[in-house]
Amino acid sequence: MEDSSDSFSKLNTDVSRETLLLFHKYRDLIINEKQSLISKNDQKHIWIRHFHDSLRLSNFIELSDLNIIDIGSGAGLPGIPLALVSNKKNHYYLCENRRKRADFLNEVI
């Protein structure tokens, strides 16, 4: 199992203890979800394959006062991880047309 703090240090991203707790809660929701939002194998590597990869996008966008749309959001990736580290400087919109996944996203947010 991966270490969450190691994942953030590889990105040179400092996150508060509160933000790290939110990532852990989000991870638990994804892993415990019955509809298999990510594969069983990916669950072991969620910090790198999903959270770390999502946050790499922050290197390419200015994270301040933006409206960001995550189309086909599925499990909320990359929208939710980006929202967690942007410190409410942006507005995020998660778009998902599959009802069960949209219900999951509503539960998360």
Please name every model-derived segment.
Residues 2-63, 69, 107:
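Class I SAM-dependent transferase core
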Residues 55-109:
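Conserved SAM/SAH cofactor-binding pocket of Class I
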